[in-house]
Swiss-Prot record:
Taxonomy, superkingdom: Bacteria
Keywords, comma-separated and alphabetical: Cell membrane, Membrane
Major localization listed first in the record, in broad terms: membrane
Species lineage: Bacteria, Bacillati, Bacillota, Clostridia, Eubacteriales
GO cellular component, one term: plasma membrane
Membrane disposition: Peripheral membrane protein
HAMAP family registered for this protein in UniProt: UPF0161_YidD
Subcellular location field: Cell membrane
Annotated family: Belongs to the UPF0161 family.
Purpose of the protein: Could be involved in insertion of integral membrane proteins into the membrane.
Protein name per its UniProtKB record: Putative membrane protein insertion efficiency factor
Pfam family name, one: YidD
Amino acid sequence: MLKIILIHIIKFYRKYISPLKKPCCRFYPTCSKYALDAINKYGAFKGSIMAIKRILRCHPFNPGGYDPVK
């Protein structure tokens, strides 16, 4: 149940909020796509933790690059 709610929140963000902002994610796939993949693969709790860690790494001092869900 929580997994479905989180997925809908991320999809809402990607559809309605993300287009209003300039592209700023330093990683591929984007942080929101990474969060969707992590939650789908590992579930709500572990996937959310992975997504939070990824978002915290997404800043101007990190070079970014290719970083898929493993």
